[in-house]
């Protein structure tokens, strides 16, 4: 989607109906907390929702709880230049104490032109201990006329003391239909068949699906599967093919971890297929024409070993091991 997708109001976003009801109830009662924690999977719209909520809070049209999209405040939100909206994002993978201190200093002043200043702290699960302790002081004694919206990945740990001082709003994966509709609004709009494949493989995360689309990850994945599914390929006899494929994977750089997640989905589907179980993600679309019929017949032991090999590769990347070497070892183990 664009910066605000179908509009600049959170009520116009696709999915997350439970989150909408919780926020609208707060609007209706006039009892907004001093801090929200939007917690859910990566790429399902938490930050986009937060921006839409900020726009709605400061909209000059008070006839409805959403944002009108046309008043002075909404136009500033749309252009990304609203003086009473702050965004704090991780720097080099973490929110640092200097960022929190600067935020606290800004909160000591009243909003410039709105009733409420909104601060969005993205990915607070990346926050270092000293930064988290500094934030706790603000959450314990929040300044008036300010709303903090924290976002966190549900698979990552957040300090219980932070959670207890926020109203938690759960976010969930979107339906395949909603994910396809969101992909249709992307500049790189995929064809319907590709959109449904992306929606299935992203497991309802439009952000992840968009990443797959922009990086042409599906095409790379098909090449990798074509190599590892080739029954004639022998790592001892044809190492050059595996090494060249590893180079292609390593070129994904910071997008290599989500690529490995995609590879795990395919291996998991192969495992479910081998067990004759129906609950699969539909990754058969990753197979090149003819691959399904000539693919290697893998035992359950081999499929489990493959999943373990990908898990090891993920851990090695997290330790900043050489990407190309990690990919080479992985492919030789698959």
Predicted features along the sequence, with ranges:
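Catalytic acidic motif of RecA-like/P-loop NTPases
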Residues: 122-128, 133-140, 156
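Conserved catalytic/switch belt of AAA+ P-loop NTPases
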Residues: 108, 133-150
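Charged, glycine-rich active-site and insertion segments that engage polyanionic ligands
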Residues: 1-55, 73-76, 144-145, 154-262, ...
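Clamp-loader machinery-focused feature within the broader ASCE/P-loop NTPase space
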Residues: 2-130
């Amino acid at each position: 989607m664009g910066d605000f997708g179908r509009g600049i109001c959170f009520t116009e976003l696709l999915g997350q109906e439970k989150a909408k009801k919780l926020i609208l109830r707060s609007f209706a009662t006039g009892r907004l907390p001093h801090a929200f924690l939007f917690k859910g999977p990566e790429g399902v719209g938490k930050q986009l929702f937060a921006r839409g909520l900020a726009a709605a809070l400061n909209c000059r049209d008070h006839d409805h709880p959403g944002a009108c999209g046309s008043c002075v405040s909404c136009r500033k939100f749309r252009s990304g230049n609203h003086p009473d909206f702050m965004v704090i994002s991780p720097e080099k993978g973490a929110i640092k104490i200097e960022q929190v201190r600067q935020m606290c200093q800004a909160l000591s002043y009243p909003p410039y032109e709105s009733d409420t200043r909104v601060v969005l702290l993205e990915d607070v699960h990346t926050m270092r201990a000293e930064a988290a302790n500094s934030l706790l002081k603000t959450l314990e004694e929040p300044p008036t006329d300010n709303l903090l919206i924290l976002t966190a990945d549900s698979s990552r740990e957040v300090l219980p003391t932070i959670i207890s001082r926020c109203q938690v709003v759960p976010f969930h994966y979107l339906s395949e239909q909603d994910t396809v509709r969101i992909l249709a609004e992307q500049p790189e709009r995929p064809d319907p068949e590709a959109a449904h494949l992306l929606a299935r493989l992203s497991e309802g995360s439009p952000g992840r699906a968009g990443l797959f689309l922009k990086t042409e990850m599906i095409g790379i994945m098909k090449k990798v599967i074509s190599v590892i599914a080739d029954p004639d390929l022998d790592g001892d006899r044809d190492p050059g093919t595996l090494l060249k494929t590893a180079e292609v994977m390593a070129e994904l750089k910071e997008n290599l971890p989500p690529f490995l997640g995609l590879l795990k989905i395919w291996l998991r589907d192969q495992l479910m297929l081998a067990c004759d179980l129906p609950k699969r993600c539909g990754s058969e679309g990753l197979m090149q024409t003819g691959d399904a019929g000539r693919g290697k017949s893998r035992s359950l032991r081999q499929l489990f070993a493959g999943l373990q090999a990908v898990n090891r590769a993920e851990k090695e990347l997290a330790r900043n091991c050489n990407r190309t070497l990690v990919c080479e070892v992985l492919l030789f183990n698959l």
